[in-house]
Structure formats: C-alpha cells, structure tokens
Amino acid sequence: LFCLLWVTVLTLSFAVPVLADLSHRKTNLEVVIKDHAGQPLPDAFLTLKMKRHAFRFGTQIRDHLVAISEEEFQVLSAREKQALMDPATEELGLAAHTPSWQDAERYREVLWNNFNHAIPTNGMQWIQYNNRGPEIVDKVVNLLKTKQFTVKGHSVVWPRDRWPTPDQFRSSVNQINPSIFYHQLLSDRLQDSGILGRFSDLGVGPAITDWDVLNEPMNNSYYADVFVDAGFYSSNTETFADFFKRAKGVRPDATLSINEYGILNAPNDNNARAYRDFTADLLAAGAPIDVIGVQAHMSRGNVDKASMLRRINILAETGLDIEITEFDTRDDA
C-alpha cells in the first residue's frame, strides 16, 4: 500500500507541471445542436469523434520501403532488401538487417496508425532523383495522399561536398567547372524545369506545397564557397538567400523551410543562438523563409526539457514558425 501511494504521489507531482505546460494546447469548445428549422435542441444527445488531428505528427520515411509492392520486393537480393532500411545501422557498427515482407507491412502499419505527415528521406535528393527518376517518389507521395497525409519535400538544396551532390560536382573531382555546377543546380533544383516545378499544380507530379529549401547550411557551406569564389555571389549569406528567392519565384504558393541539426540536443545554447543569427541574416538579405526547422535526433541524457524549451524560445526570436523536422530517438535513449 505504501509503495502504491508513493507511486501515485510521484505521478501526480510529475503530471501537474506537465499538464500546466500543455495548457496552451487546449481550449474550450461550445457545440450548439439545432433542428432543421434552426431552433436549438437543448436535450439532444451528441457523439463526437475526432477524424483528424490539426497538429502534424510527422516522421521521415524510407521511400522505397513504403512504395514497393510485394511482387517487386520478393525478387530483390538480400543486399537490395537491406538497402530499403535505414543505413545508419552500419554507421553505428550494427549488422545490416535483411527485412522480410512482413517487416515492410509492419513498417507501413506503424506509419498509418501513428502519423499524419511524412517526409520522404532520399528520393528527392539531387543525385538520387537524377539517377533514379521520379517513379518511386510519385508512387509514395500519391500513396501518402490517399492516406490523408500531408507531405514535405526534402530537400531542394543540401550543400554538402558529398552525397547527395552529384559526383562530378564534388571537390574530389580535379577540375570542377563552377559555371556548369551552378547552372545545373539551378536547372535541376531551383527553376520551373526542376523538382520544385514538377511537384506543383502546374507540374506532372503530385503537388507538394511544403519544402525544405536549404538543409544543414550552417554545417555545409560547400556550394556557397564554390559560387562565391567563382564570383557569382559576394557572400555565403547572399548565396543562400538567393536560393530561397529562386524557390519562391518557382513556387509562390509553397511554404519554404530552412533545416538544421545539433540545435536542441547540443551541450549548450550556443548552436541555437548561432542558428537564430544565421537565419536572421538570411531574412535581412531578403530570403523568403517561412519556417525554421529543427532536427531532433535524441540520445539518452543529452538534454533536459528546460534546455529544449529555452532553445526553442531563442529560435522564436526570428519571428518564424518553428518545426521539429526529424525527431527520432536511439534505442538506448
């Protein structure tokens, strides 16, 4: 009895501040039932059922794993099946898992039952999209839409000196032609002819109105470095701001985001302040940014609730909407 009472007291002491923190997410709802003549029915019995959350519960998905049919799956080699899964297992030194068709079905079941928003992980990335085309992306986006999901395009520009930048534009190539690099980027990613135009109401693909335009720019300045050195821009800020301007020119209807990692789960607030200032500089340069995105790859004990809230409030100083874009937890978290 003592143990039960102690647990109850502990639970209540924890619940009170948590519920208080969530008070801004609640409101009173008044429902008036009327008859066909518009007269109130005071004794009416009403049953309400939520059909859809207004809040977007989102997750990144393995595009091909969601889109593939059983017939297509069964003819894959073991290595090809492994490639459908998260490659991070190998990065963590774990043995690659070879999924069964039942695994694929369970993956989808968890997706349909727990989320209403999804971000295809790889299919829209520059090199992946160029090499494999839009077939898988079209299929998965259309499937998500039939399930009443909203979809975010990820990502228009990820300015890394490695994947997903096409091989011929990486610094490991002896002779990079900055002009070809620049104009190919614009054509493929930031013009009507590119990915933004294709996945629009005027394009041939399913329309996507929410895009990560610039992914991880604080940690990847490779494109800006090349283009500034070539004289196309005067600074990295001007470069990245122009990417947003071009994206908005192609898709004035779209919500455009910047996205960065190492903010909420950093050892201190310095990254949050740097991200705030980085984004503010882009806004001052005329970048039409709508959302500041924050990845949240969490592991055990690396941040507490107060620190996360403080960092979110730092980002709120930009005046932009804030979105947690890539939340996940390690198995040991």
Task: Locate predicted features.
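Bacterial N-terminal signal peptides
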Residues: F2-S13
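Beta-strand-rich domain onsets/edges
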Residues: P17-V66, H117, W126, K152, ...
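Conserved, mostly hydrophobic/aromatic
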Residues: V31, A118, W211, I292
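Aromatic-lined carbohydrate-binding surfaces of glycoside hydrolases
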Residues: D63-H64, T121-Q128, F149-R170, N215-N219
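Short, acidic/polar
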Residues: A67-A88, A95-W112, H183-I195, N270-L282
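Catalytic domains of carbohydrate-active enzymes, especially glycoside hydrolases
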Residues: A83, L94, P99-Q125, L143, ...
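Active-site cleft segment of glycoside hydrolase catalytic domains centered on the general acid/base Glu
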Residues: Q128-K139, T165-D277, N302-R310
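Active-site clefts of carbohydrate-active enzymes
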Residues: R162-P164, T255-A266, V294-R300, L315-A333
